[in-house]
UniProtKB/Swiss-Prot annotation:
One of its GO terms (biological process) is urea transmembrane transport. The keyword Cell division does not apply. It is found in: Cell membrane; Basolateral cell membrane. It catalyses: urea(in) = urea(out). It comes from Rattus norvegicus (Rat). Keywords: Cell membrane, Glycoprotein, Membrane, Transmembrane, Transmembrane helix, Transport. GO terms for molecular function: urea channel activity; urea transmembrane transporter activity; water transmembrane transporter activity. This is Urea transporter 1. Gene3D superfamilies: Ammonium transporter AmtB like domains (1.10.3430.10). Expressed in brain, spleen, kidney, testis and lung, with highest levels in brain. Glycans are attached at N206. One of its GO terms (cellular component) is basolateral plasma membrane. Belongs to the urea transporter family.
Length: 384
């Protein structure tokens, strides 16, 4: 009878050990699929080139939102298929062609492997399909999509050479340049490849504040994130947020906050409700909030506030760019995000808590913060 309590204690101890091991195993597995999946990339190095190439393409698709994670790329591709399979196909074609062009031009292999030579062409392919006046499955569009995607590595390499003097990223400037060139060359009245007609505002919008819908405003938050890829389906935007969350919860949080600030900016300028509901006020500010809030600046409460300011500034600047670009019958694209965020990254300050990450060390928000804290500790511990 005296042995029974002892056996119970032993069983409880074993169950606690097994439970701890299970948790550790779960965390280890989670570590392999979150962040930038560096271990997976290392594992692929001696595998067939086809598998490596698929990894590069998926990372390129996800790099639009600063994520280098193939599983996130699969989720984003699934979201694009939910929105429109034709857009997804054009985006994939653009990514593949751009990556192959970068290989032919002997661009940095590590940048190609991280998807940095594919993401601009992802947007080029998708947005050329979105703005095509021929509708879906106009197969001839594949040719200009491929041609313009080939220019993206050229623009990226040239801009990188220029921006490297200040250790700045090129963001989506190659996409903006390629798409603007294409739409300027073709336009709405082109016989072969007509695009949608972009016109400046010519009358005062009819705003009735009593018709403002709280539900539509709530839906506009994921839609704002979805519009980064030109998508207006809230389910697609929600999938994109999940893809970002898988890689970095901090980046997902800032993506949602940025979209919210874009909505607030739109309401403060009495923008047409349909523009706010469709996410057109949220996507640039969402990207800006991610970029400053932990991606290219280490996350502290100071840089978090700076990210909020940058997101609001980007949203208002986006309205300015929309009017300016409409005057020449072009969409605003992500010009406001690129220009506003570069402006904030060039900010100089003596505050050590506003720390811009060296471009070669940028990974994802959580890892960037660890690098910043370790660097800060080394500075404190080093002798004078």
């Amino acid at each position: 009878m005296e042995d029974i309590p002892t056996m119970v204690k032993v069983d409880r101890g074993e169950s606690q050990i097994l439970s701890c091991r299970g948790r550790r195993c779960g965390l280890k597995v989670l570590g392999y699929v979150t962040g930038d999946m560096k271990e997976f990339a290392n594992w692929l190095k001696d595998k067939p080139v086809v598998l490596q190439f698929m990894d590069w393409i998926l990372r390129g698709i996800s790099q639009v939102v600063f994520v280098s994670n193939p599983i996130s790329g699969i989720l984003i591709l699934a979201g694009l298929l939910v929105q429109n399979p034709w857009w997804a196909l054009c985006g994939c074609v653009g990514t593949v062609v751009s990556t192959l062009t970068a290989l032919l031009l002997s661009q940095d292999r590590s940048a190609i492997a991280a998807g940095l030579q594919g993401y601009n062409a992802t947007l080029v392919g998708i947005l050329m399909a979105v703005f095509s006046d021929k509708g879906d499955y106009f197969w001839w569009l594949i040719f200009p999509v491929s041609a313009m995607s080939m220019t993206c590595p050229v623009f990226s390499s040239a801009l990188s050479s220029l921006f490297s003097k200040w250790d700045l990223p090129v963001f989506t400037l190659p996409f903006n340049m390629a798409l603007s060139l294409y739409l300027s060359a073709t336009g709405h009245y082109n016989t072969f490849f007509p695009s949608k007609l972009f016109m400046p505002v010519s009358s005062v919008p009819n705003i009735t504040w009593s018709e403002l819908s709280a539900l539509e405003l709530l839906k506009s938050l994921p839609v704002g994130v979805g519009q980064i890829y030109g998508c207006d389906n809230p389910w697609t935007g929600a999938i994109f947020l999940c893809a970002i969350l898988l890689s970095s919860p901090l980046m997902c949080l800032h993506a949602a906050i940025g979209s919210l600030l874009g909505v607030i900016a739109g309401l403060s300028l009495a923008a047409p409700f349909k523009d706010i509901y469709s996410g057109l006020w949220g996507f640039n500010s969402s990207l800006a909030c991610i970029a400053i809030g932990g991606m290219f600046m280490a996350l502290t409460w100071q840089t978090h506030l700076l990210a909020l300011a940058c997101a609001l500034f980007t949203a208002y600047f986006g309205a300015c760019m929309t009017h300016l670009m409409a005057a020449v019958h072009l969409p605003a694209c992500t010009w406001s995000f690129c220009l506003a965020t570069l402006l904030f990254l060039l900010l100089t300050t003596e505050n050590p808590n506003i720390y811009r990450m060296p471009l070669s060390k940028v990974t994802y928000s959580e890892e960037n913060r660890i690098f910043y804290l370790q660097n800060k500790k080394r500075v404190v511990d080093s002798p004078l």
